From Swiss-Prot:
Residue numbers covered by motif Nuclear localization signal 1: 63-70
Location of region: Disordered: 65-98, 151-186, 243-264
Name of this protein: Protein OVEREXPRESSOR OF CATIONIC PEROXIDASE 3
Record GO biological process: abscisic acid-activated signaling pathway; defense response; defense response to bacterium; defense response to fungus; defense response to oomycetes; induced systemic resistance; jasmonic acid mediated signaling pathway; regulation of abscisic acid-activated signaling pathway
Function summary: May modulate chromatin structure by regulation of nucleosome assembly/disassembly. Homeodomain transcription factor that mediates jasmonic acid (JA)-mediated COI1-dependent and abscisic acid (ABA)-mediated PMR4-dependent resistance to infection by necrotrophic fungal pathogens (e.g. B.cinerea and P.cucumerina) and bacterial pathogens (e.g. P.syringae DC3000); this resistance involves at least callose deposition. Required for the P.fluorescens WCS417r-triggered JA-dependent induced systemic resistance (ISR) against both P.syringae DC3000 and H.arabidopsidis.
GO molecular function, a single term: DNA binding
Any single Gene Ontology cellular-component annotation: nucleus
SMART domains: HOX
Keyword Repeat in record: yes
Portion annotated as DNA-binding: 286-345
Induction, per UniProt: Constitutively expressed in healthy plants but repressed in response to infection by necrotrophic fungi. Repressed by drought and abscisic acid (ABA).
Pfam family, one: Homeodomain
Amino acid sequence: MIKAMALSSAGVVSHLHPPSFSSSSGLSVNRVLFRNRNASPCGLSLPILNPSRSVLVFARGKNRKGFVSSSSSSPKKNKKKSLDGADNGGGEEEEDPFEALFNLLEEDLKNDNSDDEEISEEELEALADELARALGVGDDVDDIDLFGSVTGDVDVDVDNDDDDNDDDDNDDDDDDSEEDERPTKLKNWQLKRLAYALKAGRRKTSIKNLAAEVCLDRAYVLELLRDPPPKLLMLSATLPDEKPPVAAPENSSPDPSPVESLSAEDVVVEPKEKVKDEAVHVMQQRWSAQKRVKKAHIETLEKVYRRSKRPTNAVVSSIVQVTNLPRKRVLKWFEDKRAEDGVPDKRAPYQAPV
């Protein structure tokens, strides 16, 4: 559109300054633009100009195959595209890369023969030789993998990596490496003890005591019990269902005579007295009878004794209530006090003074 407007403006300028060159049709531009020079310029007629190639390219680029132009594009974007098309007006039409790629694929499919034969063994050997030369391995075809890896090299690399890791671990944990040193061959008594433990089960066996007994590392004993070797399994299957012999302590005396002298007849088992179930009030009375008489209680009893050597039952009940002493204890105290003072048990009849 901008190009067409520019061309139309150029025609108007040519009206003001008419050029002297002639058109391709053999008629002068003056004749085409102004048929009557004496007449007023209101009857202006412009020649029909063919659109330039760049405008056609720009218009065609909008409607290319495989691209859908959005109707909601902003006018600024359209203006920018039109300016780019105007700048590249003199260039040739650029091909779409996707269309060129599809065209190449179609040509390859057309040229491709459907009767291709499978790869023969000779071609495979030739390919293996080329890979060997490229990798610098040699002519050994068995060590070469067609996917680009060499089996021998991979094994060597893996071994080297493992060796490196082992070296690092040994440098970092020297103490662990010393603890992990395991005997190459177990002795018969160690195998027998481990077989008994395997037969009994790990849950019923103290791993710590077992490791100390067989003089092995605890981790190694655990590994043997979790994944026992075939020899240990066979030995465990042949063992009878008996407990292993308990080793005698070193400090024990070899003569077992004192142990045998103790027989069941000599040992006398004293029967335990069965505690009878007693009532609460009986237990309370026994406890109160064992209660110690305090000094304040004695003072109260002495005050009552000064007033009456033989207190009545009401007075005794009040004393029991105040002192929380048992009744028998109170009566016993009064009897002992009368015996100390020499008061007779029976009261003598009253005699009037003469």
